[in-house]
Swiss-Prot record:
Catalyzed chemical reaction(s): D-fructose 6-phosphate + L-glutamine = D-glucosamine 6-phosphate + L-glutamate
Lineage: Bacteria, Pseudomonadati, Pseudomonadota, Gammaproteobacteria, Pasteurellales
Protein name stated in the entry: Glutamine--fructose-6-phosphate aminotransferase [isomerizing]
GO molecular function: carbohydrate derivative binding; glutamine-fructose-6-phosphate transaminase (isomerizing) activity
Main location: cytoplasm
PANTHER family in UniProt: GLUCOSAMINE--FRUCTOSE-6-PHOSPHATE AMINOTRANSFERASE, ISOMERIZING (PTHR10937), GLUTAMINE--FRUCTOSE-6-PHOSPHATE TRANSAMINASE (ISOMERIZING) (PTHR10937:SF0)
Annotated GO biological process: carbohydrate metabolic process; fructose 6-phosphate metabolic process; protein N-linked glycosylation; UDP-N-acetylglucosamine metabolic process
Keyword vocabulary terms for this entry: Aminotransferase, Cytoplasm, Glutamine amidotransferase, Repeat, Transferase
Ranges for domain Glutamine amidotransferase type-2: 2-218
Function: Catalyzes the first step in hexosamine metabolism, converting fructose-6P into glucosamine-6P using glutamine as a nitrogen source.
């Protein structure tokens, strides 16, 4: 992994490829490379360690030009970050870029070495290049060669292959890692993400599992997993050209934090009428499916998992539907029992998360009554493969640490909870009206939370010399504590953990001292007195407390305990509201620490490998 761009055109494609890589930088990477065939059918390749800008300068210095090319940003999986391990990889006249993991690459490597091939990298991708070269000894068609090669591969891949002897076409293959074809006029493109191509086209074809595609300047031919020609519908992208621009903000994460009121308003739009949730807005046949639901199984990873954990409280408390939440990488590898009338819900920002996709495919074999995804990317694999897709409308999220995707997931989940409760008879009309009013107030309430930006910036100074932090919450605020800890560790590199506050006695209290900041989410609710007891446990052991609560909670700031007094909000939407100060705290601490906020080390935006 991480980013692929390909282009075939009459004009020079070097700038298109480099600009595409720039647009994919948000996904995270450690090295980059480009290969272009010139008019004399010579392969020109440049690879470098570090940022795409370094590659761009090298391409300009070497005056690389040509009408057919491929480019890649790499996030190391096999082999350390290095120029030798950077893509494209070459074997003879063939160049390959690849996202994914080839699980049987070691045996393939041994077989190829016995055939006389020498390996210049530690990557699994170089195996693909040599396999193509080997098959083409007895083959004239690159398309047929790639179709033969993919049959030998086990694992996940999204790849593009280029032949400098036949530069009039590119061949791509997709299994477990996304690829999209961009359609131009007299030119065509390939990428792992449509964002890479927004400056050259708005029309896209999303390849499906097992597809192999051959593109020329004027044609696109796609073949399914069985080698049969297929038609895939094209889609017009509604993403804006400046979707990947920071504007006046210092970082994408900062921009995305402050975009949340609008993102939630967009997510609610057209789905609420007066004080009702429009069940039909969830999708065709939604009401018929939802009224039968007796159990919810949520599967997700990372931030999306935390959103699912909040939703569990809503499903059970508000809609009276039992709900389980599981990490996708665990769910897919265990033997589970499918409950009767159970609906599977997958959560993902990208819709391409490898473990979540695998969990969906497994669950569809195990007798779930239906599969729904809550996702931010139309046309993604999760959307295409699910029975229902309830889309968030967060817009493009560039920062690796998710912000607006998380809160729009929660808003969407709450709408779904209300819809299921209504059609199953567990939520009355008056309850629905109250819940919808709370949802409609959410954008304005988040604006109020964002107004605490400067106060939280000052608070963040206390974390300048800290190496550890503990987050506490009870009930639906425990997952918000989890999200706060995740954000802090992701972008500030402070070791942060979250615990249900009632678990303090069972281990975490041993960590408490004056150097351990303890962040507590403690708004007024039925569990407040329990949380206060937990806070006293920390105070009595000399811990430094930072409590986020409303005025009615009755906290008084004392030595060793700072209070961030927040406005009182409706209890149902309060978990979403209290997410905002957690995001702001993580952001400002990361600024103080001097880390790369938008592209934290070792992390990628879309995890398309296991």
């Amino acid at each position: 992994m991480c980013g692929i761009v390909g282009a075939i055109a009459q004009r020079d494609v070097a700038e298109i490829l480099v600009n595409g890589l720039h647009r994919l930088e948000y996904r995270g990477y450690d090295s980059a490379g480009i290969a272009i065939v010139d008019q004399e059918k010579r392969l020109q390749r440049v690879r470098c360690l570090g940022k795409v800008q370094v590659l761009a300068e090298a391409v300009a210095a070497e005056k690389i030009t040509g009408g057919t090319g491929i480019a890649h940003t790499r996030w190391a999986t096999h082999g350390a970050p290095s120029e030798d391990n950077a893509h494209p990889h070459v074997s003879g006249q063939f160049a390959v870029v690849h996202n994914g993991i080839i699980e049987n690459y070691e045996q393939l490597r041994i077989d190829l070495q016995q055939k006389g091939y020498q390996f210049l990298s530690q990557t699994d991708t170089e195996v693909i290049a040599h396999l193509v070269h080997w098959v083409m000894r007895n083959e004239t068609s690159l398309l047929r060669a790639v179709q033969q090669v993919v049959k030998q591969l086990k694992g996940a891949y999204g790849m593009v292959v280029m032949d400098c002897e036949q530069p009039n076409h590119l061949v791509a293959a997709r299994s477990g890692s996304p690829l999209v074809i961009g359609l131009g006029i007299g030119e065509n493109f390939l990428a792992s993400d449509q964002l890479a191509l927004l400056n050259v086209t708005r029309r896209f074809i999303f390849l499906e599992e097992g597809d192999v595609a051959e593109i020329t300047r004027r044609t696109v031919d796609i073949y399914d997993v069985n080698g049969h020609p297929v038609q895939r519908d094209s889609q017009d992208s509604h993403l804006t050209h400046d979707a990947t621009e920071k504007g006046t903000f210092r970082h994408f994460m900062q921009k995305e934090i402050f975009e949340q009121p609008r993102a939630i308003l967009n997510t609610l739009e057209g789905r609420l009428h007066q004080h009702n949730v429009l069940v039909d807005s969830i999708g065709n046949g939604a009401e018929r499916l939802l009224e039968q639901v007796e159990h919810i199984q949520i599967v997700a990873c990372g931030t999306s998992y935390n959103a699912g954990m909040v939703a569990r409280y809503w499903f059970e408390h508000l809609a009276g539907i039992s709900c389980d939440v599981e990490i996708a990488s665990e769910f897919r590898y265990r033997k589970f029992v499918t409950r009767p009338k159970s609906l599977l819900i997958t959560l993902s920002q990208s819709g391409e998360t490898a473990d979540t996709l695998a969990a969906l495919r497994l669950a569809k074999e195990k007798g779930y009554m239906g599969a729904m995804t809550i996702c931010n990317v139309a046309g993604s694999s999760l959307v295409r493969e699910s029975d229902l897709a309830f889309m968030t409308r967060a817009g493009v999220e560039i920062g690796v640490a998710s912000t607006k995707a998380f809160t729009t997931q929660l808003a969407t989940l709450l709408m779904l909870v209300i819809a299921i409760g209504k059609v199953t008879g567990n939520i009355s009309l008056s309850q629905e009206e109250e819940l919808v009013k709370a949802l409609q107030s959410l954008p304005a309430e988040i604006e109020k939370a964002l107004a605490f930006n400067q106060q939280i910036e000052s608070l963040a100074q206390d974390f300048a010399d800290k190496h550890h932090a503990l987050f506490l919450g009870r009930g639906e605020y425990y997952p918000i504590a989890m999200e706060g800890a995740l954000k802090l560790k992701e972008i500030s590199y402070i070791h942060a953990e979250a615990y249900a506050a009632g678990e303090l006695k069972h281990g975490p209290l041993a960590l408490i001292d004056a150097d351990m900041p303890v962040i507590v989410v403690a708004p007024t609710n039925d569990l407040l007195e329990k949380v206060k007891s937990n806070i006293e446990e920390v105070r009595s052991r000399g811990g430094q407390l930072y409590v986020f609560a409303d005025k009615e909670a009755g906290f008084t700031e004392t030595e060793g305990m700072k209070i961030m007094t927040m406005p009182k909000v409706n209890e149902v939407i309060a978990p979403i509201f209290y997410t905002i100060p957690m995001q702001l705290l993580a952001y400002h601490v990361a600024l103080i620490k001097g880390t790369d906020v938008d592209q934290p080390r070792n992390l990628a935006k879309a995890v398309t490998v296991e």
